[in-house]
Amino acid sequence: IFGMIPGLIGGLISAFK
């Protein structure tokens, strides 16, 4: 679970930037 969270956050940041 905690391993997937960084991936999701990273995807959102990439999409936001």
Curated annotation (Swiss-Prot):
This protein's major location comes to secreted
Q: Name one GO cellular component term.
A: extracellular region
Asked if Secreted is a keyword of the record, the answer is: yes
Q: Does the keyword Secreted apply?
A: yes
Looking at the UniProt entry, the stretches that span the membrane are none
The entry's localization annotation reads: Secreted
- In which tissues is this gene expressed? Expressed by the venom gland.
The UniProt keywords, alphabetically, are: Amidation, Secreted
Residues annotated with Lysine amide modification: K17
Hey, which family's this protein in? Belongs to the non-disulfide-bridged peptide (NDBP) superfamily. Short antimicrobial peptide (group 4) family.
Q: What does this protein do?
A: Antimicrobial peptide with low to moderate activity against most of clinically relevant Gram-positive and Gram-negative microbial pathogens (P.aeruginosa (DSM 50071); MIC>400 ug/mL, E.coli (DSM 787); MIC=100 ug/mL, K.pneumoniae (ATCC BAA 1705); MIC>100 ug/mL, A.baumannii (DSM 30008); MIC=50 ug/mL, S.aureus (ATCC 43300); MIC=25 ug/mL, S.epidermidis (DSM 28319); MIC=25 ug/mL, E.faecalis (MF 06036); MIC=50 ug/mL, E.faecium (NCTC 12201); MIC=25 ug/mL, C.difficile (DSM 27147); MIC=25 ug/mL, C.difficile (ATCC BAA 1382); MIC=25 ug/mL).
**Protein name in the entry:** Peptide TtAP-2
Which organism does this record belong to?
Tityus trinitatis
Source species taxonomy: Eukaryota, Metazoa, Ecdysozoa, Arthropoda, Chelicerata
